[in-house]
């Protein structure tokens, strides 16, 4: 009787493996053409067991990324993913397109103003949405008033007034004595006051400027790395690395300001032709607009 009882118990244990609520394990098969066939099971909305077969083709895409980001991707997994292979897992991760989303802080207020403005102002906004800000001093994507070199370099159109027509002096300036208009004109813009003074970074500025222009800079360059490279020759007062507004990568040029022009000349001589991140740097003194 004991043997019959044990057999009955064993038969009951065997029946437990045929539980209809249990799903078979996922099967991954590697094909000869390099693709993978993944077979998995799931329950549909009606509670029926459904077999899902996916054929995956792996494509290797070579991409240049920041070395620090690549190092973090090679870290060992932890937590519930501890011990799993590197890369995303099909069970827990759904790989999709990388979408860059930059929300605005006051986007609700801006949307309300756009609706109140009407179609006329909305069309102007659509016309200006593709416009980019360009600095008149270093040609960077920022406002000229925020340029870090506004005190050391002159803007490109500084001498635009020098090419005025010869007969322009005979026309009375607006806002002066006897003018027929009531619009106010500042004294420094009136007739005869153009030569009364010069801007701080004008042509009378001292000639011992110590700003270097570095070109052929890698997209992965950082301001701290450039500072470390040039501080070997003297005290660096400012480092400006032009970046793209969309990708935040370097645009290929930078400005390095030294406290002493002698240090800048030595750095220009040593760093011109220096290899940095598989590129050859081109270093020269920044030229002011004439």
Curated annotation (Swiss-Prot):
| Keywords for the protein's UniProt record, in alphabetical order | Cytoplasm, Initiation factor, Protein biosynthesis, RNA-binding
- Which family does the record claim for this protein? Belongs to the eIF-3 subunit G family.
Q: Which residue range or ranges hold the RRM domain?
A: 210-288
Show the SUPFAM superfamilies listed in the entry. RNA-binding domain, RBD
Task: Give the matching PROSITE patterns.
Answer: RRM
Q: Which InterPro entries match?
A: eIF3_g, eIF3g_N, eIF3G_RRM, Nucleotide-bd_a/b_plait_sf, RBD_domain_sf, RRM_dom
Q: What is this protein called?
A: Eukaryotic translation initiation factor 3 subunit G
> Which terms in the Gene Ontology molecular function aspect does this entry carry?
RNA binding; translation initiation factor activity
Compartments (UniProt record): Cytoplasm
Entry function: RNA-binding component of the eukaryotic translation initiation factor 3 (eIF-3) complex, which is involved in protein synthesis of a specialized repertoire of mRNAs and, together with other initiation factors, stimulates binding of mRNA and methionyl-tRNAi to the 40S ribosome. The eIF-3 complex specifically targets and initiates translation of a subset of mRNAs involved in cell proliferation. This subunit can bind 18S rRNA.
Task: For the region Disordered, give the residue spans.
Answer: 1-34
State any GO CC term.
multi-eIF complex
Q: What's the source species for this entry?
A: Neosartorya fischeri (strain ATCC 1020 / DSM 3700 / CBS 544.65 / FGSC A1164 / JCM 1740 / NRRL 181 / WB 181) (Aspergillus fischerianus)
Q: How does it assemble?
A: Component of the eukaryotic translation initiation factor 3 (eIF-3) complex.
Query: Which example biological process does GO assign this protein?
Result: formation of cytoplasmic translation initiation complex
């Amino acid at each position: 009787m004991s043997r019959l009882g044990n057999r009955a118990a064993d038969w009951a244990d065997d029946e437990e493996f045929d539980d209809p609520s249990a799903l078979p394990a996922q099967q991954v098969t590697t094909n000869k053409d390099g693709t993978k066939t993944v077979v998995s099971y799931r329950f549909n909305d009606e509670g029926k067991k459904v077999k899902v077969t996916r054929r995956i083709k792996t494509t290797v895409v070579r991409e240049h990324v920041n070395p620090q980001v690549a190092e973090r991707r090679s870290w060992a997994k932890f937590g519930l993913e501890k011990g799993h292979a590197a890369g995303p897992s099909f069970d827990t991760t759904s790989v999709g397109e990388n979408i860059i989303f930059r929300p605005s802080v006051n986007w609700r207020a801006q949307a309300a103003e756009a609706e109140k403005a009407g179609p006329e102002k909305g069309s102007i906004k659509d016309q200006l949405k593709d416009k980019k800000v360009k600095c008149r001093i270093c040609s960077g994507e920022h406002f000229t008033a925020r340029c870090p070199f506004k005190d050391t370099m002159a803007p490109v159109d500084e001498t635009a007034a020098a090419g005025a027509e010869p007969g322009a002096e005979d026309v009375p300036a607006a806002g002066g004595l006897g003018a027929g208009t009531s619009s106010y004109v500042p004294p420094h813009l009136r007739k005869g006051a153009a030569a009364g003074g010069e801007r701080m970074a004008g042509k009378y500025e001292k000639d011992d400027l110590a700003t270097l222009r570095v070109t052929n800079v890698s997209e992965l360059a950082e301001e701290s790395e450039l500072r470390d490279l040039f501080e070997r020759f003297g005290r660096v007062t400012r480092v400006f690395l032009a970046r793209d507004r969309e990708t935040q990568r370097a645009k290929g040029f930078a400005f390095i300001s030294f406290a002493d022009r002698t240090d800048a000349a030595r750095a220009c001589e040593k760093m011109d032709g220096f290899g940095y991140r598989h590129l050859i740097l081109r270093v020269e003194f920044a030229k002011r607009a004439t």
